[in-house]
Regions:
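N-terminal, active-site-proximal structural segment of metallo-dependent hydrolase catalytic domains
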Residues: 1-53, 57, 63-71, 84
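Active-site beta-strand/loop signature of hydrolases that rely on acidic residues for catalysis
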Residues: 10, 26-44, 107, 136-158, ...
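Internal catalytic-core helix/loop-beta-alpha segment
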Residues: 84, 90, 100, 126-140
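Surface-exposed cleft-lining segments at the edges of enzyme active sites
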Residues: 87-88, 113-129, 165-169
Length: 212
């Protein structure tokens, strides 16, 4: 399989980054595949230019909740197939995923649920986690190679956020959330960000409300 450069970015609003030179950046950086999360745009709010960028095929899964969620995929390489759901009963209605089959591997671009709003949302998030890992296990058992891009809405270790202690009892850094990432790694997946950035002060988690 030829090498590919895949980028993942939670943009916290597609329209906002579009106004700040997103297209210019993409045309200069030119990754083979770009996965965006939390695009926060309905279908009619997606800038038309993004559907015809030179050298890229674009796919959008706008969030079902207005102004929230949603993912996008920009790819230079044609996919064999593409799905806008994970096939998880009761969890696909928020439109959090794009699944692209490149033949040699499956690419999952996922915006995982946030559990901060309530105990119910935390429970929803943890159930989503469990079902997602079950899905990964089934696909690996079938012989598929998998790349997961996205925002899991959890900081794995203290090195991943600026102020770990104040966040220990807040969703996003709870022991049970962090333990799920441990399980994901135990099941054979690699944290590629930490693979390339093992040093401190290279944070993989940022909360817009707590600013850390």
């Amino acid at each position: 399989m030829p090498s590919m450069r895949i980028l993942s970015w939670n943009v916290n609003g597609l329209r906002a980054i579009y106004k700040k030179g997103f297209v210019d950046w993409l045309m200069i950086d030119r990754p083979d595949v770009l996965c965006l999360q939390e695009i926060k745009a309905t279908e009619d709010q997606i800038p038309k230019e993004l559907n015809g960028l030179p050298g890229y095929i674009s796919f959008f899964s706008p969030g079902a909740r207005k102004g929230r969620d949603g993912v996008a995929l920009f790819t230079k390489i044609k996919t064999l197939s593409l799905e806008y759901s994970l096939g998880l009963p009761g969890f696909d209605d928020e439109q959090r995923a794009i699944v692209a089959d490149y033949g040699d591997f499956l690419l999952f671009n996922v915006y995982f649920p946030n559990g901060k709003a309530s105990k119910e949302r935390l429970s929803y998030k943890m159930r989503f986690y469990d079902l997602f890992l079950d899905l990964m296990d089934r696909l690996v058992a079938e012989g598929r190679d998998i790349v997961i891009c996205g925002d899991v809405n959890t900081a794995h270790k203290e090195i991943d956020l600026a102020r770990p202690k104040p966040n220990e009892k807040i969703s996003g850094f709870l022991p049970e959330e962090r333990a799920w990432i441990d399980r994901l790694i135990e099941h054979g997946f690699l944290d590629t960000f930490r693979l390339f950035h093992p040093e401190g002060e290279k944070y993989s988690f940022w909360d817009m409300k707590t600013r850390a």
